[in-house]
Regions:
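Conserved serine/cysteine hydrolase catalytic core
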Residues: 74-127, 133
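Cofactor-binding loop segments of dinucleotide-utilizing enzymes, especially the Rossmann-like FAD-
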Residues: 19, 113, 136
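Catalytic histidine-centered segment of alpha/beta-hydrolase-like enzymes
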Residues: 137-150
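Flexible "cap/lid" loop of the alpha/beta hydrolase fold
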Residues: 2, 6, 10-45
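C-terminal alpha-helix
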Residues: 152-157
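Active-site loop signature of alpha/beta-hydrolase-fold enzymes
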Residues: 22-24, 118, 140
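Conserved alpha/beta-hydrolase catalytic His-Asp/Glu region
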Residues: 43-95
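Conserved aromatic
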Residues: 42-43, 134, 143
Length: 157
């Protein structure tokens, strides 16, 4: 969203929720390791959905049969299943969040759930002092309470 907000003139506003802005060296090394691993194939769709929900932090927030859960899984030619995400995405390393925010040609709202252990609002406030705390929510605030995000967007038009 931040890249689009910085490159397109027809986007008025983007919101970044729970964006991790502070990375330890060991986290960056783990990301590189993940990027270099081969795709992990699973025997059943159910196993793949379970894995997707786990790595996405969505266990207990999203039902296994939901479109959200199912969209996180891809089917191979040999009737095996994998996560839809390409492991190569982790090769990006530390995202330049501050640079992307400052380059955006639209309004950027940054927010984090009050209980987000991965991406706290204090880290976001180093980039944008107006970053918002989403009360009572965690890292997947957009799933936990979509109405809270709509409210935030509506208040900041």
């Amino acid at each position: 969203a931040l890249v689009l907000g910085g490159s397109q003139g027809n986007i008025e506003q983007v919101i970044g929720v729970g964006i991790k802005t502070r990375w330890r060296d060991e986290e960056l090394a783990r990301m590189q390791d993940l990027a270099e691993r081969p795709v992990r194939w699973l025997a059943t769709r159910e196993e793949a959905v379970e894995r997707y929900l786990k790595v996405s932090g969505l266990v207990g927030l999203v039902k296994e049969v939901s479109l959200c859960a199912q969209s996180g899984v891809a089917t191979g030619d040999d009737d095996r299943y994998r996560l839809s995400t390409d492991p190569g995405i982790y090769a990006i390393g530390e995202p330049p969040v501050a640079t992307l925010v400052s380059a955006a040609r639209c309004q950027v709202l940054l927010a984090a759930g009050e209980h987000d252990a991965m991406a706290g609002v204090e880290d976001l406030k180093a980039i944008d002092p107006a970053a918002t705390i989403l009360s009572g929510l965690g890292h997947n605030a957009q799933v936990e309470d979509p109405a809270a995000l709509w409210s935030l967007l509506s208040e900041n038009k």
